[in-house]
Amino acid sequence: MHWLRLIFGLILVFALFRWTADVLGSNRGEFGVIIGLLVVGTTIAAKIFLFNRSFKESFSDVGLTRPNALGVLIAVVICVLMLVSIFVFASVTDSSFSFYPSWYLLVPGLFFQAGIAEETLFRGYLFGFIRQKYSFWKAAGISAVPFILVHLIMFYSLPFAIAFASILLSVVLSFPLARLFELGGNTIWAPAILHFVVQGTVKVLVASGESAQTFPLFWITVCAVIPLLVFLLPEKKIISPG
């Protein structure tokens, strides 16, 4: 019965998430703050009404409490390494990059929409629930399935090669995002930072030059490989919230 409630809540919140983003046309986080707050609010409401949890319990359940510094630090280091790779790409391919017009106005919305909203739903609500019953790898694997399915929509908006690579990325990325969730003390902030950089970078940077068209696939590869460094940290270092 709990599984049916879990799936119902997931579908309900995600449907609202997608519908709101489509109606508002928030492809680059233009209305991301509003969408993020809406998703967080409805996810908490789902925990309250579907699982009979209090507001305080639900707030904690979906990972919105104060994070452990370790997880956030690791997420930041991984993101810095990923961003440095862009300079390497530019140097090797003789490409150049510019910022999307008014990019700085998009950053907060991208963080709320790609980072906070998605991680509250998929890591806080979904993975957090499943992790109570299964080992890390099994819980991460199960929770990866819906995360992958919702990204299939990319086949309608992206070239096949990039969409296919993006689906593979969602498979791989599910695991380091889940690990960062635990490293951060079962909170969404560390994976939200990584998720924000993964999605936000290609929405605020514009590549130009002969090799510009290869940058999306390069970035997908970087986002699939570098976050796996999180698994080099001994498992005993993972701190549960106190």
Regions found by a protein language model. Give the residues of each.
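Juxtamembrane helix-entry segments on the extracytoplasmic side of multipass membrane proteins
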Residues: 96-108, 156-169
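Membrane-interface helix/loop boundary segments of multi-pass membrane proteins
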Residues: 117-142, 182-186
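Functionally important transmembrane alpha-helices
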Residues: 164-220
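Interfacial transmembrane-helix boundary/kink motif in multi-pass membrane proteins
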Residues: 1-11, 32-40, 54-84, 99-102, ...
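Membrane-interface helix caps and helix-loop-helix hairpins in membrane proteins
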Residues: 25-27, 90-98, 154-161, 206-214
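Aromatic-anchored segments of alpha-helical transmembrane domains
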Residues: 11-20, 80-88, 144-153, 195-205
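Membrane-interface capping segments at transmembrane-helix boundaries
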Residues: 50-58, 230-242
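Alpha-helical transmembrane segments in multi-pass membrane proteins
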Residues: 2-52, 105-106, 216-223
